[in-house]
């Protein structure tokens, strides 16, 4: 085992604070509408230009082991905020730096670190309760656009496109962000349920100009097995011929004689039919077939539940307003399933998402829920160069996370105002002793730090801006975008409550632990000078000083 170096007391805290400051100073220049960019060197490809706090934090590794420990702990703050709310990483870093700096000063002055931490924790619990009281629901499309715009660094086009996407696919819908081919951002919305399976034979195509199959008011047959014998399908096809309606078959596979007969009947116009493979594999396929059944009001024909294809009737089939099948995708639009059953299925999938521990499973469940609840929207980010594309895509993703957080827990006045108002309300918090009281004061001072940093990045005097905002009341705050004061809600400067809450909680949690540090242990760096080679006939000479 390698030898370790141990540093105690103030020496340890000074080194740790130096690491905290290096990381936080690199991150906090990005805060606010006039925040600057940070350029990150990549081992391959072009450098990455970003205004995303967590991206900057993740890149930082320091040479000094003790300084690096401080930096890594603050990096954890940014990562946690990003995982929980998807945004607010820079705010969390600024808060953590402010609490650690003030806290370590107090420890150096002889105060009890544990009491300081208790005071900070009490202040944060009270602040979170006040934040929730201050929060307002984010109901309309305009508020959603404003939240997205602020998070995307005041880019209104991103705010608009996210609001439109949410309006079209609903709050439970899936919105994904991709790199586009054009110069402008584009929104692609797939309404209804789409899955990635195309027609089994090109002879089903009835719209040659688009190379697709379109069925109006079709029946939908769902089968959880391979169909190779046409005899099994005859009762359904005979019943169908009398109605004159088209049929979509979704099965594990349709092959051989069965597929050939369907194609011939389709080409002769006896029955309008199209067949596609069921989406997914194994248990996921069974679940997705059940989703389609609930959406269309049909039944999955599966032998394991005692249903045979030969005995199926038209009552077992689902129906939809329209089905469009291309080479790669099948889209079922306006299934005729019962709304109550669809909602029950959505809440069941929601429960599975909460219980799942795998990110992959969560993503797939989220997609299934979206397809049942409304649809899927794809935002294609447009830019002139690859460097700009990556930077813009990161901003769109941040804005999307912020919007989701706003819909979940509501919004508070932005620009650091919410924390300042909350701090003024909990100034008289009751504590047990003077050291705890000072812990509360540290937390209250730290809550001003985001506002001060926004002002500094905008080229203003932080103290002047902070005092002006503190002298105001309610939603009154500083708009760094155009250097004016006024009602933040009216100016459309909103922050999601969840983002502000998570930033404060995670910053206080880790900063509180750092204040109570008394010793640090790290490996002693090895002197890796190579041994000297030996001269003729001699052995090596070992490392020389």
Swiss-Prot record:
<comment type="subunit">
    <text>Forms a cylinder of 14 subunits composed of two heptameric rings stacked back-to-back. Interacts with the co-chaperonin GroES.</text>
</comment>
<dbReference type="GO" id="GO:0042026">
    <property type="term" value="P:protein refolding"/>
</dbReference>
<feature type="binding site">
    <location>
        <begin position="30"/>
        <end position="33"/>
    </location>
    <ligand>
        <name>ATP</name>
    </ligand>
</feature>
<dbReference type="Pfam" id="PF00118">
    <property type="entry name" value="Cpn60_TCP1"/>
</dbReference>
<comment type="similarity">
    <text>Belongs to the chaperonin (HSP60) family.</text>
</comment>
<dbReference type="InterPro" id="IPR027413">
    <property type="entry name" value="GROEL-like_equatorial_sf"/>
</dbReference>
<feature type="binding site">
    <location>
        <begin position="87"/>
        <end position="91"/>
    </location>
    <ligand>
        <name>ATP</name>
    </ligand>
</feature>
<dbReference type="GO" id="GO:0016853">
    <property type="term" value="F:isomerase activity"/>
</dbReference>
<dbReference type="InterPro" id="IPR027409">
    <property type="entry name" value="GroEL-like_apical_dom_sf"/>
</dbReference>
<keyword id="KW-0067">ATP-binding</keyword>
<dbReference type="InterPro" id="IPR002423">
    <property type="entry name" value="Cpn60/GroEL/TCP-1"/>
</dbReference>
<feature type="binding site">
    <location>
        <position position="495"/>
    </location>
    <ligand>
        <name>ATP</name>
    </ligand>
</feature>
<protein>
    <recommendedName>
        <fullName>Chaperonin GroEL</fullName>
        <ecNumber>5.6.1.7</ecNumber>
    </recommendedName>
</protein>
<dbReference type="InterPro" id="IPR001844">
    <property type="entry name" value="Cpn60/GroEL"/>
</dbReference>
<feature type="binding site">
    <location>
        <position position="415"/>
    </location>
    <ligand>
        <name>ATP</name>
    </ligand>
</feature>
<dbReference type="GO" id="GO:0140662">
    <property type="term" value="F:ATP-dependent protein folding chaperone"/>
</dbReference>
<dbReference type="GO" id="GO:0051082">
    <property type="term" value="F:unfolded protein binding"/>
</dbReference>
<keyword id="KW-0963">Cytoplasm</keyword>
<feature type="binding site">
    <location>
        <position position="51"/>
    </location>
    <ligand>
        <name>ATP</name>
    </ligand>
</feature>
<dbReference type="GO" id="GO:0005524">
    <property type="term" value="F:ATP binding"/>
</dbReference>
<keyword id="KW-0547">Nucleotide-binding</keyword>
<dbReference type="InterPro" id="IPR027410">
    <property type="entry name" value="TCP-1-like_intermed_sf"/>
</dbReference>
<comment type="function">
    <text>Together with its co-chaperonin GroES, plays an essential role in assisting protein folding. The GroEL-GroES system forms a nano-cage that allows encapsulation of the non-native substrate proteins and provides a physical environment optimized to promote and accelerate protein folding.</text>
</comment>
<dbReference type="GO" id="GO:0005737">
    <property type="term" value="C:cytoplasm"/>
</dbReference>
<keyword id="KW-0413">Isomerase</keyword>
<keyword id="KW-0143">Chaperone</keyword>
<dbReference type="InterPro" id="IPR018370">
    <property type="entry name" value="Chaperonin_Cpn60_CS"/>
</dbReference>
């Amino acid at each position: 085992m390698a030898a370790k170096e141990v540093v105690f007391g103030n020496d340890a805290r000074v080194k740790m604070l130096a690491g905290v400051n290096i990381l936080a100073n690199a991150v906090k220049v990005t805060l606010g509408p006039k925040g600057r960019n940070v350029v990150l060197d990549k081992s391959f490809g072009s450098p990455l230009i970003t205004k995303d706090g967590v991206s900057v934090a993740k890149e930082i590794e320091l040479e000094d082991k003790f300084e690096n420990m401080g930096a890594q702990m603050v990096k954890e703050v940014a990562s946690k905020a990003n995982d929980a709310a998807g945004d607010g990483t820079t705010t969390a870093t600024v808060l953590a730096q402010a609490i650690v700096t003030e806290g370590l000063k107090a420890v150096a002055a002889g105060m009890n670190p544990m009491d300081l931490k208790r005071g900070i924790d009490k202040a944060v619990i009270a602040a979170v309760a006040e934040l929730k009281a201050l929060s307002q629901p984010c109901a309309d499309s305009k508020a959603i656009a404003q939240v997205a715009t602020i998070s995307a660094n005041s880019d209104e086009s991103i705010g608009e496109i996210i609001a439109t996407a949410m309006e079209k696919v609903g709050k439970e819908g899936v919105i994904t962000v991709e790199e586009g081919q054009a110069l402008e951002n584009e929104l692609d919305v797939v309404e209804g349920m789409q899955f990635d399976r195309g027609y089994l034979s090109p002879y089903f195509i009835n719209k040659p100009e688009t190379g697709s199959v379109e069925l109006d008011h079709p029946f939908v047959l769902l089968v959880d097995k391979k169909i190779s014998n046409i005899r099994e399908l005859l009762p359904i096809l005979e019943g169908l011929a009398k109605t004159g309606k088209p049929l979509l078959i979704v099965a594990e596979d349709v092959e051989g004689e069965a597929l050939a007969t369907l194609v011939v009947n389709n080409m002769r116009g006896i029955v309008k039919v199209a067949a596609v493979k069921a989406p997914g594999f194994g248990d996921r396929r069974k679940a997705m077939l059940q989703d389609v059944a609930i959406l269309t009001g049909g039944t999955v024909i599966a032998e394991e539940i005692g249903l045979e294809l030969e005995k199926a009737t038209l009552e077992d089939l689902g129906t939809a307003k329209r089905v469009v099948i291309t080479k790669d995708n099948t889209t079922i639009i306006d299934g005729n399933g019962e709304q109550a059953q669809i909602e029950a299925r959505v809440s069941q999938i929601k429960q599975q998402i909460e219980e799942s521990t795998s990110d992959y499973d969560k993503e797939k469940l989220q997609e299934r829920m979206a397809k049942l609840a409304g649809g899927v929207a794809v935002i294609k980010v447009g830019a002139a160069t690859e460097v700009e594309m990556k930077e813009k895509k990161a901003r769109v993703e941040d804005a999307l996370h912020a919007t989701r957080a706003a819909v979940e827990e509501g919004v508070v006045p932005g620009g650091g105002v919410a924390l300042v108002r909350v701090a003024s309300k909990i100034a008289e918090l009751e504590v047990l002793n003077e050291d705890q009281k000072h812990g509360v004061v540290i937390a209250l001072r730290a809550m001003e730090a985001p506002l001060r940093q926004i002002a500094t990045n905008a080229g203003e005097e932080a103290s002047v801006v902070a005092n002006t905002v503190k002298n105001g009341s309610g939603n009154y705050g500083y708009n760094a975008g155009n250097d004016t004061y006024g009602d933040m809600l009216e100016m459309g400067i909103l922050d999601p409550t969840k983002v502000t809450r998570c930033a404060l909680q995670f910053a206080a949690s880790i900063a509180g632990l750092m204040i109570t540090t008394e010793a640090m242990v790290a490996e002693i760096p090895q002197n890796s000078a190579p041994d000297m080679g030996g001269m003729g006939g001699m052995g090596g000479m070992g490392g020389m000083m």
